[in-house]
Amino acid sequence: MIYNMKIVIVGDGKVGYTLTKSLSEEGHDLVVIDNNRRILLASQESLDVAVVDGNGASVEVQREAGVDTADLLIAATNGDETNLLCCMVAKKLGCKHTIARVRNPEYDQQIRFMREELGLSMVINPEKAAALEIFRLLQFPSFLKRDSFARGNAEHVELKLKDGNPLIGKPLQQFRTVADVNALVCAVE
């Protein structure tokens, strides 16, 4: 059984709306906060979400949104400082987890401090994350799929061996010797 979370999303712009749409499709209980009533009403009509019109950094607005009983608050406004303040307020109100969108590279050196001192569960810089993902994919262009897990300590990769590859026809016991890698083969098609 999948656990449906109560999630509050602050900011109904491109990032916030995309998150709201995806999480709504997964069946989570969502409340969206934004100070643009027109955009909020459009989201409310097109998605299965509750909305609160107001400043997401406001204690009263967050209370109205039910942050005190939320599993997660995601602050995805265009303002880094607003996002950080939203998360601080949510944590003080009793929200279990908070995620802040922080785009300014000046804050990169302070992320650990922000997580520890401000009680943030995660800080995300979308542009930096996209650049790192592109770099990661370009490192091994032959991989059809590449996913990290265990906090980046392990990876699952999918690749198709081309004709003439020295691994073709070899027993799996010889994989590490022939490929000269420390890997565990999970499946062969």
Regions found by a protein language model. Name each.
Residues 1-189:
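Cytosolic regulatory regions of ion transport systems
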